[in-house]
Amino acid sequence: DAGNIYGRLTNPTQGVLEQRIAALEGGIAGLAVASGAAALTYAFENITRAGDHIVAAKTIYGGTYNLLAHTLPAYGVTTTFVDPSDLFNFERAIRENTKAIFIETLGNPNSNIIDMDAVAAIAHKYRIPLIVDNTFGTPYLIRPIEHGADIVVHSATKFIGGHGSSLGGVIVD
Protein backbone atom coordinates (compact mmCIF):
# COMPACT_ATOMS: atom_id res chain seq x y z
CA ASP A 1 0.00 0.00 0.00
CA ALA A 2 1.56 3.27 -1.15
CA GLY A 3 -0.44 5.33 1.32
CA ASN A 4 -1.85 8.78 0.83
CA ILE A 5 0.61 10.67 -1.38
CA TYR A 6 -1.38 13.68 -2.56
CA GLY A 7 -5.13 14.08 -2.09
CA ARG A 8 -5.80 15.33 -5.59
CA LEU A 9 -4.34 12.15 -7.09
CA THR A 10 -5.99 9.65 -4.78
CA ASN A 11 -6.87 9.06 -1.18
CA PRO A 12 -8.10 6.07 0.82
CA THR A 13 -11.77 7.10 0.88
CA GLN A 14 -11.77 7.81 -2.85
CA GLY A 15 -10.28 4.38 -3.47
CA VAL A 16 -12.99 2.72 -1.39
CA LEU A 17 -15.71 4.65 -3.26
CA GLU A 18 -14.25 3.60 -6.62
CA GLN A 19 -14.01 -0.06 -5.57
CA ARG A 20 -17.54 -0.14 -4.21
CA ILE A 21 -19.18 1.53 -7.20
CA ALA A 22 -17.26 -0.82 -9.51
CA ALA A 23 -18.49 -3.78 -7.44
CA LEU A 24 -22.09 -2.51 -7.53
CA GLU A 25 -21.87 -2.22 -11.32
CA GLY A 26 -20.10 -5.56 -11.77
CA GLY A 27 -17.09 -3.80 -13.26
CA ILE A 28 -13.37 -4.25 -12.86
CA ALA A 29 -12.42 -0.79 -11.63
CA GLY A 30 -13.82 2.66 -11.05
CA LEU A 31 -12.56 6.21 -11.21
CA ALA A 32 -14.16 8.94 -9.11
CA VAL A 33 -14.05 12.43 -10.61
CA ALA A 34 -15.40 15.88 -9.78
CA SER A 35 -18.77 15.61 -11.56
CA GLY A 36 -20.92 13.57 -13.90
CA ALA A 37 -19.92 15.92 -16.70
CA ALA A 38 -16.27 15.19 -15.92
CA ALA A 39 -16.97 11.43 -15.98
CA LEU A 40 -18.50 11.68 -19.45
CA THR A 41 -15.78 14.00 -20.71
CA TYR A 42 -13.01 11.68 -19.47
CA ALA A 43 -14.73 8.64 -20.97
CA PHE A 44 -15.13 10.25 -24.39
CA GLU A 45 -11.68 11.88 -24.40
CA ASN A 46 -10.04 8.57 -23.50
CA ILE A 47 -11.56 6.87 -26.55
CA THR A 48 -11.66 9.61 -29.19
CA ARG A 49 -9.21 11.87 -30.97
CA ALA A 50 -9.63 14.61 -33.59
CA GLY A 51 -11.34 13.14 -36.64
CA ASP A 52 -13.27 10.52 -34.65
CA HIS A 53 -17.02 10.05 -34.41
CA ILE A 54 -19.58 9.08 -31.76
CA VAL A 55 -23.12 7.77 -32.21
CA ALA A 56 -25.52 8.81 -29.44
CA ALA A 57 -29.19 8.50 -28.67
CA LYS A 58 -30.83 11.87 -29.15
CA THR A 59 -32.92 11.48 -25.98
CA ILE A 60 -30.15 12.32 -23.53
CA TYR A 61 -29.47 14.83 -20.79
CA GLY A 62 -29.05 18.37 -22.11
CA GLY A 63 -25.60 18.82 -20.62
CA THR A 64 -24.40 15.65 -22.34
CA TYR A 65 -25.98 16.79 -25.58
CA ASN A 66 -24.08 20.08 -25.31
CA LEU A 67 -20.80 18.23 -24.65
CA LEU A 68 -21.30 16.06 -27.73
CA ALA A 69 -22.82 18.69 -30.03
CA HIS A 70 -20.78 21.76 -29.11
CA THR A 71 -17.71 21.06 -26.96
CA LEU A 72 -16.20 17.94 -28.52
CA PRO A 73 -16.55 19.25 -32.11
CA ALA A 74 -14.14 22.05 -31.13
CA TYR A 75 -11.60 19.24 -30.67
CA GLY A 76 -12.51 17.55 -33.95
CA VAL A 77 -14.85 14.88 -32.55
CA THR A 78 -18.30 14.75 -34.15
CA THR A 79 -21.49 13.04 -33.02
CA THR A 80 -24.50 11.72 -34.88
CA PHE A 81 -27.64 11.77 -32.74
CA VAL A 82 -30.17 9.05 -33.55
CA ASP A 83 -33.77 8.30 -32.66
CA PRO A 84 -33.38 5.30 -30.34
CA SER A 85 -36.93 4.06 -30.94
CA ASP A 86 -35.56 2.37 -34.10
CA LEU A 87 -32.47 0.42 -33.05
CA PHE A 88 -31.23 0.16 -36.63
CA ASN A 89 -30.61 3.92 -36.50
CA PHE A 90 -27.55 3.15 -34.39
CA GLU A 91 -26.15 0.80 -37.01
CA ARG A 92 -26.96 3.14 -39.89
CA ALA A 93 -25.08 5.98 -38.18
CA ILE A 94 -21.84 4.03 -37.70
CA ARG A 95 -18.93 5.26 -39.79
CA GLU A 96 -15.42 3.99 -40.31
CA ASN A 97 -14.20 6.48 -37.69
CA THR A 98 -16.90 5.76 -35.07
CA LYS A 99 -15.21 5.14 -31.72
CA ALA A 100 -18.16 4.95 -29.29
CA ILE A 101 -21.89 4.49 -29.01
CA PHE A 102 -23.57 6.31 -26.12
CA ILE A 103 -26.94 5.77 -24.43
CA GLU A 104 -28.56 6.30 -21.04
CA THR A 105 -30.31 3.53 -19.11
CA LEU A 106 -33.20 5.90 -18.50
CA GLY A 107 -33.27 8.81 -20.89
CA ASN A 108 -33.13 12.16 -19.15
CA PRO A 109 -35.61 13.87 -19.09
CA ASN A 110 -38.07 11.53 -20.89
CA SER A 111 -37.30 8.31 -18.99
CA ASN A 112 -37.30 6.37 -22.25
CA ILE A 113 -35.74 2.92 -22.06
CA ILE A 114 -33.49 1.65 -24.85
CA ASP A 115 -32.92 -2.04 -25.56
CA MET A 116 -29.37 -2.02 -24.22
CA ASP A 117 -28.65 -5.63 -25.18
CA ALA A 118 -29.54 -4.90 -28.81
CA VAL A 119 -27.46 -1.70 -28.92
CA ALA A 120 -24.54 -3.56 -27.32
CA ALA A 121 -24.81 -6.27 -29.99
CA ILE A 122 -24.66 -3.60 -32.71
CA ALA A 123 -21.69 -1.87 -31.06
CA HIS A 124 -19.76 -5.09 -30.59
CA LYS A 125 -20.51 -6.26 -34.14
CA TYR A 126 -18.39 -3.29 -35.24
CA ARG A 127 -15.93 -3.56 -32.31
CA ILE A 128 -17.11 -0.23 -30.91
CA PRO A 129 -17.38 0.31 -27.15
CA LEU A 130 -20.80 1.05 -25.68
CA ILE A 131 -20.76 3.81 -23.06
CA VAL A 132 -23.84 3.91 -20.82
CA ASP A 133 -24.88 6.63 -18.40
CA ASN A 134 -26.52 4.80 -15.50
CA THR A 135 -27.19 7.88 -13.36
CA PHE A 136 -30.95 7.40 -13.24
CA GLY A 137 -31.00 3.61 -13.53
CA THR A 138 -28.45 3.06 -10.74
CA PRO A 139 -26.92 -0.38 -10.16
CA TYR A 140 -29.86 -1.06 -7.83
CA LEU A 141 -32.17 -1.30 -10.87
CA ILE A 142 -29.82 -2.29 -13.70
CA ARG A 143 -26.19 -3.18 -14.18
CA PRO A 144 -25.32 -2.15 -17.76
CA ILE A 145 -22.13 -4.23 -17.90
CA GLU A 146 -24.32 -7.34 -17.59
CA HIS A 147 -26.18 -6.11 -20.69
CA GLY A 148 -23.10 -5.48 -22.82
CA ALA A 149 -21.92 -2.02 -21.77
CA ASP A 150 -18.17 -1.54 -21.86
CA ILE A 151 -18.03 1.66 -19.82
CA VAL A 152 -20.59 2.93 -17.30
CA VAL A 153 -20.70 6.50 -16.05
CA HIS A 154 -22.63 8.14 -13.24
CA SER A 155 -23.34 11.60 -12.03
CA ALA A 156 -22.86 10.70 -8.37
CA THR A 157 -24.59 13.97 -7.50
CA LYS A 158 -27.95 12.29 -8.15
CA PHE A 159 -28.89 8.91 -6.67
CA ILE A 160 -25.42 7.58 -5.81
CA GLY A 161 -24.77 10.65 -3.61
CA GLY A 162 -28.21 10.50 -2.05
CA HIS A 163 -29.65 13.98 -2.05
CA GLY A 164 -27.72 16.16 -4.48
CA SER A 165 -25.78 17.58 -1.55
CA SER A 166 -22.43 16.40 -2.91
CA LEU A 167 -20.88 16.75 -6.33
CA GLY A 168 -19.17 13.87 -8.09
CA GLY A 169 -18.98 11.48 -10.98
CA VAL A 170 -17.80 7.91 -11.49
CA ILE A 171 -16.51 5.94 -14.46
CA VAL A 172 -16.61 2.12 -14.31
CA ASP A 173 -15.13 -0.40 -16.73
What kind of feature is each model-predicted range?
Residues 29-173:
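Conserved PLP-enzyme active-site core in the AAT-like
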Residues 1-23, 28:
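A glycine-/small-polar-enriched, mobile loop at the entrance of the PLP active site in fold-type I
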